[in-house]
Amino acid sequence: LALAHMGQRVLCLDCDITLRNLDLALGLSDRALMDFSDVLEGRCTLREAAVPHERYPSLSLLTAPMADRPLSLSVPKLQALAREIRESYDWCLIDAPAGLGQGFQMAACMADQVIVITTTDVSAMRDAQRTAAELSAFPSGTVHLVVGRVSKKVLRQLHTTIDDAIDAAGLPLLGVIPEDPDVPYCLNRGLVLREQNYYAAR
């Protein structure tokens, strides 16, 4: 949203096949009728499938399909879609699903840079470490770590630090997102954190 406010053309690409939810977070669930599989298979164009935000027209969403079985995602088609996105937008933010399945592989195939987002939970840090290992083919300096839901109280209780998360993932730290109870409230209602001036958006 900050990029869109600066006049940049931004596309949010949801790669969470069958379990998409980025449309809900952006308040676009009733408008996202076509998905990236429709573009890949030639049923519509990228421009037709990408849904612009009503209040922020330079911010658009290309959602994931609600498929009940794995899709046939060929690398040449994905690369062609990536080229078209680069020509049409200044930024493409790809939301990869948890795990190392088809959606993750698609995101990794199309991305130029990667941000691994984790929390200070032990299980989350282990997942981040595994994800970082899968991304070892990316050039040095293109994969970074963001630690979310950080509160001083939780850090004291768990006897963990941000350094532990960095060491576990083996990635350079890009930033830290503080714990904010208003985040789930906004997500459930499709509200924009930045508009409400909530803590995590400052």
Identify the function of each model-found stretch.
Residues 1-15:
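A conserved segment at the C-terminal end of the G1
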